[in-house]
Amino acid sequence: MLLLTLRRAKGRDRGRPAGGPRRALSLPWSPAWICCWALAGCQAVWAGDSSSSGRPLPACQEKDYHFEYTECDSTGSRWRVAIPNSAVDCSGLPDPVKGKECTFSCASGEYLEMKNQVCSKCVEGTYSLGSGIKFDEWDELPAGFSNVATFMDTVVGPSDSRPDGCNNSSWLPRGNYIESNRDDCTVSLIYAVHLKKSGYVFFEYQYVDNNIFFEFFIQNDQCQEMDATTDKWVKLTDNGEWGSHSVMLKSGTNILYWRTTGILMGSKAVKPVLVKNITIEGVAYTSECFPCKPGTFSNKPGSFNCQMCPRNTYSEKGAKECIRCKEDSQFSEEGASECVDRPPCTTKDYFQIHTPCDEEGKTQIMYKWIEPKICREDLTDAIRLPPSGEKKDCPPCNPGFYNNGSSSCHPCPPGTFSDGTKECKSCPAGTEPALGFEYKWWNVLPANMKTSCFNVGNSKCDGMNGWEVAGDHIRSGAGGSDNDYLILNLHIPGFKPPTSMTGATGSELGRITFVFETLCSADCVLYFMVDINRKSTNVVESWGGTKEKQAYTHVIFKNATFTFTWAFQRTNQGQDNRRFINDVVKIYSITATNAVDGVAASCRACALGSEQSASSCVPCPPGHYIEKETNQCKECPADTYLSIHQVYGKEACIPCGPGSKSTQDHSLCYSDCFFYHEKENQTLHYDFRNLSSVGSLMNGPSFTSKGTKYFHFFNISLCGHEGRKMALCTNNISDFTVKEMVTGSDDYTNLVGAFVCQSTIIPSESKGFRAALSSQSIILADMFLGVTVDTALQNVNIKEDMFPVSPSQVPDVHFFYKSSTATTSCINGRSTAVKMRCNPMRPGAGVISVPSKCPAGTCDGCTFYFLWESAEACPLCTEHDFHEIEGACKRGLQEILYVWNEPKWCIKGISLPEKKLSTCETVDFWLKVGAGVGAFTAVLLVALTCYFWKKNQKLEYKYSKLVMTTNSKECELPAADSCAIMEGEDNEEDVVYSNKQSLLGKLKSLATKEKDDHFESVQLKSSRCPNI
């Protein structure tokens, strides 16, 4: 009834118009008075009930009730009222009195004593934050906190149909901290709090992996962000360091969100976000102090926190001090709530080390218990520590160091060198020391290296050595827990090239190479990290699980202070017992070249001055090598580049690949966008200058196992620009997550420059962010190999079935690139091939595509293929690409036109020749000539035909007469000279037998196809004249 009355009174006050007059406290019907009258009414009812039963109620004692404040009214006033405890019947409760103002609160270490309404100090074993609350116990999710897992991608189909949903994704309590999800779901840790006055929220966190988005923001009770600013992005921290974050809170309801979203594009596991010690200031008063949690204590009044019990002690809830364990049979970790029995010792409880060399050059193998020692040797099944003291010969000094007769190795003086087994010697004239470090013998930890151990959840291994030397290798130490980070650091103040290469530009300054192996039975991980100028530690590469002995090289291109870090973690799950103590990593050698403070294992040739007396080394100009005969600087030949590893001898100048040329300083090779190819006695000229600007390809979409949609974005800088790498890929995740740095610092950059680079793009709608996200930018190519029509160059091969066959007869041109950085999956680095194809239907920049069988552009993750189709990839036009067409002759003039061959497979180049006119004879003239000749020929043929016909008739007649005459005279020879002349006929013609043919005879013979004489002697035979 009291609560109902309070709500009604409060509701009536809220219903007052905003501009209406306020009710004075002295009015009998103010909300506070209504509450008081309601309380009095309740007491009267209780009294009436008791009197009606005939049983008088006892007077209320202080133990029978407690005080509370009413809700604040619109004037900021409230009343203190007495509330009977449950199951207590009494009478005579104290009357309501005016309470403290609503914004009142006590200081840290104090609480509000409600009887007198004054602040009092907390007693021993308790603590108070005053007007704040603190969450530092994460054995389970504290009351008021909630987990909400959402999937913000817009994929087709209901979320229930996804093979792997987000229902099991949540923040996980880990004892002293809470850990975020590791997948690509969006999980929010939510806490709602109502503040009586302005305050703040403060928490500590560890956030080292930018493959997870980490946001902290605040909403009101209407689910609206209080301040929609970029401050919600939490900054990255270094490995092992706890950062802090605080945000001001407004009075009223504040809903706090810790939200993480994983961006998983590969197989590597991400490091989760860790949060601890959440403190909220500005809440209502506290009327009591909180008891210290088990494992902590408070030994003085007015404490605002409790201290953790040291190791081998424990405490219960509300303890004033810690109780020691029985040290001979029990132990406890720091902050323990109880002691546990010590287990028997096993082989997992000790490790071996090598002592420094003694004066005899011997080292001892020593066995030590893992500290702190928690096992017992006096139990039945316990093992004892193996005997120590076995002596072995010390390994020699590392290259660049020498032994001066003592038990330690010393660096060689400047200008000298040693292989580690002999004394230091001065470099001969014309040479200089090859500075660097080569650590391959591990008897003691080198001076510029240090080792440590830390754990995000406890301090067991603080002060321990994370790594131990072991003769021919250095190995991970025991640590305090299986999830410890075992740290090994190498500090190098800077890098510089050899003297002869001081003027070179664009080349590497040095490199660090190490040989290692891991032996693991669980999910161990080895991280290799680089810190530049002590500002940002970034993970360069990581290896999980057991790895065979292998080498890894990291190239240095910038002169800065570097700290290289190797961090080894056996497992990411913390447990009380040690299960993976035998999981180790071994590093056999670490080599750093061109270190500023390095030592020399050998000497290398250097260039001498031009003067005869000069004996000191001088730097060569860029692109010059050292001539062996004279030790003088000499420029590399054209189209060669200078090796970044050695400059001695002409062989240091390496020829450029096909179709490429060197820069002026011979630092690298590049394509000037022109290419020439001989084909069938024809030279094809290609001009790719219009494609020299960066070409882009957005490929996808693809989806992760959780369904996150992402795209692969490629940038290609094909040629030109004097070899400058114009393709840039950005990481805009780092715009929100990188640590604060000095303005203008270029130690940490969000841009990746290369010939070919790749970014992973997550669209804005995929994760509910306001802009698309670009992450995981990698260099696919930073070295140009060459350009050729062949499909293979330097072990990069384009298979015939990789792309569709070109419909043209113009050969495709191939640009080949590679990356100088090796990875665990690509030991020889990545390589890229770009196939340029002539396609007149693709004007301008054209279209870039990837193989259909490799939608990500690569089939193995190491070699990338692209097909770039454009009209600009066609060869320049020549005289072979057009032909002429002759027009009709008109009025004595003829027009000659030139047209391109179809289909046209060329661009630009030469232009079509202008049409030209030439003199000619018209068709009418030749028609007339032809008609005349034809008519004459026809008349001649008719005349000849008639002549020969008539001639033939006469001969036939004479022949028949001759035959008839011969038969009638029965073989009498003719008496006349003429043949068959009848009476009345004139002897008009004389028959002359002659072998000579006249002109007409020749024509007749041609007509009758006779080859011999026209008239041959014919012997006529008759049966009656056998003698003839």
Curated annotation (Swiss-Prot):
InterPro entries according to UniProt: Elapor1-like_3rd, Elapor1/2, Elapor1/2_C, Elapor1/2_GBD, Elapor1/2_MRH, Elapor1/2_TNFR-like, Growth_fac_rcpt_cys_sf, Man6P_isomerase_rcpt-bd_dom_sf
Primary localization: membrane
Localization per Swiss-Prot or TrEMBL: Cell membrane
Residues of the MRH domain: 671-876
Extracellular compartment residues: 48-928
Domain of life according to the entry: Eukaryota
One GO term describing the cellular component: plasma membrane
SMART domains, A to Z: Ephrin_rec_like
Family: Belongs to the ELAPOR family.
Function: Functions as a regulator of the BMP signaling pathway and may be involved in epidermal differentiation.
Protein name from the UniProt record: Endosome/lysosome-associated apoptosis and autophagy regulator family member 2
Organism: Mus musculus (Mouse)
Gene giving rise to this polypeptide: Elapor2
